[in-house]
Amino acid sequence: MVQKYFGTDGIRGKANSFPMTPDFAMKVGMAVGVLFRSQHQSRRVVIGKDTRLSGYMLENALVSGLTAAGMDVFLLGPVPTPAVAMLCRSLRADLGVMISASHNPFYDNGIKLFGPDGFKLSDDMEAKIEQLIDTDLSKSLASSAEIGSAKRVEGDIYRYIEYAKRTLPRDVRLDAVRIVVDCANGAAYKAAPRALWELGAEVFAIHDEPNGTNINQKCGSTDLSSLKRKVHEVRADVGIALDGDGDRVLIVDEKAQTVDGDQLIAVIAENWHKMGRLRCNGVVTTIMSNLGLERFLNGKGLDLIRTKVGDRYVVDAMRQKGYNVGGEASGHIVLSDFGTTGDGLVAALQILACMKESQNPMSQLCQRFEPVPQILKNVTIKNKNVLKKNPVKTAIDQAEKRLGKEARLVIRASGTEPVIRLMAEGDAREVLDTVVTELMDVITHHDTRVDCI
């Protein structure tokens, strides 16, 4: 299903440029309000946001649209995305809205939507919303007496903190654990340091002073350099890197080595399997997860199920098949025993619990497998249909044959950025380099603009 406005993670774009404009955000609010008012009784909406400057603008526009449609809005302020999903259920809301562009720079923003169960809306629901956005809704709005209200809710960030803390086993405390947490100047800047401190850790928070324009700026899960320096400086046991909206996490061990999402999934899956907590004898990841993870899990008698890229597709597969551990190499870790979406803080707490239980340093705990050589490249393009051109399709077919059955090639258009993402992995590094370089040349040659990154 090709969608007009929604990508793999909601609606996203540059702030004050279509579709992230106040008038379009108001249309989204109206469309969502009209749809949910007709299907639910409470007419209650919760809205959270990260720390981007444009969040205020889009928040007000959404409120205008939602209240015009007769919805009552509860404004949570800056909270992590998983907090919106959790509070949507806790506050018995019909709808949850998160204003965020996740790990993107401050000048981008986006709108993510959650249903009353705390799960992101399905493709079908998003398609219905798109139809309503393009419809004249003037006759479908609330009457003067039924216009909705809006109010700010204080203290709900502490409900999320308590929720996150409860995911840690009751017999586990973090006393004497030295932790550096990089909050990415984002939505988790209050919740993450506070939760870790309340659990007994010695906490060194960095990038916890958002100003509207410094979110994800040389910090967080997309840039670990300052976190690694701080871990080394204070001799920390572990560094935790969150992204702008707090739904993904990467770890830095005491040696300042990076631990990606695949390794974190391996740690949790192995630990939960030993404890009898791992359901369905396996995990769900995406086509981008390293082949080394699959080999590691298979060696433990566990399965690995792959989905399209995007944590929503991981969650969908987990729900359909009953798995309780899933995620992406980028750090989206979904643990359905606790929540309905990726949660960086909760995932980090599970890793810390594994560290305390094993009594091993993070470097020993988290290097569970040797990653298969993998090359990731982005090609900035103007026309995403370039992959449908026959010369490009032919080149991809030839590349797959050259790599053989023991390697993998993934080429896809990004759902959030104007780029083609190429991933090749296999045991022969030189072959991977050659194949990827040749494919990049073919793609750029057949696109109307050439710009590789």
Swiss-Prot record:
The active site is at S102 (phosphoserine intermediate). Binds 1 Mg(2+) ion per subunit. It catalyses: alpha-D-glucosamine 1-phosphate = D-glucosamine 6-phosphate. It comes from the Bacteria. It is an enzyme of class 5 (isomerase). Coiled coil: none annotated. Mg(2+) binds at S102, D243, D245, D247. GO terms for cellular component: cytosol. GO terms for biological process: carbohydrate metabolic process; peptidoglycan biosynthetic process; UDP-N-acetylglucosamine biosynthetic process. One of its GO terms (molecular function) is phosphoglucosamine mutase activity. Activated by phosphorylation. Its cofactor is Mg(2+). Catalyzes the conversion of glucosamine-6-phosphate to glucosamine-1-phosphate. Belongs to the phosphohexose mutase family. This is Phosphoglucosamine mutase. It comes from Bartonella tribocorum (strain CIP 105476 / IBS 506).
